[in-house]
Design a protein with these regions (language model features):
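A conserved acidic beta->alpha catalytic loop
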Residues: 42-51, 71
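Short, well-formed alpha-helical segments that are part of the catalytic scaffolds
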Residues: 17-30
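Conserved nucleotide-sugar donor-binding catalytic segment
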Residues: 84, 149-229
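Conserved donor NDP-sugar-binding/catalytic core segment of glycosyltransferases
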Residues: 104-136
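Short aromatic/hydrophobic "clamp" motif used to bind/position activated sugar donors
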Residues: 91
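Membrane-interface aromatic/basic loop that binds lipid-linked glycans or pyrophosphate carriers
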Residues: 266-335
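Glycine-rich, basic loop-to-helix element that forms the pyrophosphate-binding segment
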Residues: 69-86, 151
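Cell-envelope/extracellular polymer assembly enzymes that use nucleotide-activated donors
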Residues: 6-9, 37, 192
Length: 335
């Protein structure tokens, strides 16, 4: 398919991003291959984000459409809304605080033009500080996100293999991924999309960075994955997991994924690799069983839960479906 025949949409979500959103929108508008539409959904910003955006959108009224949520949806649901509103063949996701390389859109379009079997294109990114000073690349700094090597199914299930600003996906993926699981503790929007994309089609990997991924302490994503400090990672873990209810959300998140994969398999929509879907479904069902076991032993006191946690550790489940010893220690120590 000719590259010019694709309609390109950008789904961008904002929340109190006045300090960064102008630079991001300018980088999108300055693409060597300009997107055809930009759908921006704001989740109740109170810092003047909308004023900044409107100054830019007034110059491009036919390209930029702004939607303001009547109530806060949260990042995952906000992206679900934005994706449901786009009308393009290819969908690019954008956080409000990153900056795209000028050739990002053109480079990622080529993946789909050269092979119609691809449902997603995925690139590397340059990690930066708040002032866009580079500190490394995602593929080199974050072990489980380097898609240059085919990830194991267990690696995908651990939840860190996909980052929204690094992906573009074909619109034929929309009926598979929407609606999202409502339990964002288990599934961020990008992990949900990437996991299902891997199940139903092919992902084309671009080995060079096409976006600056800005870290500033308020990112929606999992910054702990980039930080080597054990104390920092422990604080993040302790903040995220505080009791059996959170583990219940993770269990229900895996129930949502297993249900969705069964619906896809039985729904009659064309798949490029049904065998791969079946394998990922099997792994997802094992992840669900593991999540149920973790939830069960978290309802007990620390000493009482130790035997069941040790059984999971020695069986290898913590390494297959979680983060190994880190998750084991987390389950023992956090109430």
């Amino acid at each position: 398919m000719n590259q010019d025949n694709f309609k390109v949409s950008v789904a961008i979500c904002t929340f109190n991003g006045a300090a960064f959103v102008e630079a991001q929108l300018e980088s999108i508008l300055a693409q060597s291959r300009s997107p055809d539409e930009i759908i921006l959904c704001d989740d109740g910003s109170t810092d003047g984000t909308i004023d900044v955006v409107k100054k830019i959108s007034d110059k491009y009224p036919d390209k930029i459409k702004i939607f303001q949520n009547e109530r806060r949806l949260g990042s995952c649901r906000n992206f679900e809304r934005a994706i449901s509103l786009v009308t393009g063949d290819l969908i690019f996701l954008s956080d409000f605080d990153d900056v795209w390389f000028p050739e990002k859109v053109a480079t990622m379009i080529r993946v789909f033009a050269e092979d119609p079997g691809f449902v997603m294109a995925y690139s590397d990114a340059v990690i930066t500080d708040v002032e866009l000073r580079p500190t490394g690349t995602v593929f080199n700094r974050r072990k489980d996100t380097d898609l240059r090597k085919t990830p194991s199914l267990q690696q995908l299930s651990r939840g860190v293999a996909f980052n929204g600003p690094m992906m573009a996906f074909h619109s034929r993926l929309k009926p598979f991924v929407i609606p999202f699981s409502p339990l964002s503790l288990q599934w961020t929007h990008d992990h949900w999309i990437g996991y299902i994309a891997y199940a139903v089609g092919k992902i084309g990997v671009i080995e060079r960075p096409l976006v600056y991924y800005r870290r500033h302490g308020k990112n929606e994503g999992g910054d702990a994955e980039f930080d080597g400090g054990l104390l920092y990672q422990w604080r993040v873990v302790k903040k995220k997991y505080q009791g059996s209810e959170e583990y219940g959300e993770r269990r229900r998140g895996w129930e949502d994924m297993v249900t969705r994969l069964h619906e896809i398999r039985n729904g009659g929509l064309p798949l490029s690799n049904p065998a791969k879907l079946d394998k990922l479904l099997q792994v997802s069902e094992l992840c669900l069983q593991f999540a149920k076991a973790r939830q069960m032993h978290k309802t007990r006191g620390r000493l009482a839960r130790a035997p069941s946690a040790l059984r999971l550790l020695f069986a290898g489940d913590y390494h297959r479906y979680a983060r190994g010893v880190k998750s084991f220690v987390q389950d023992l120590l956090i109430p």
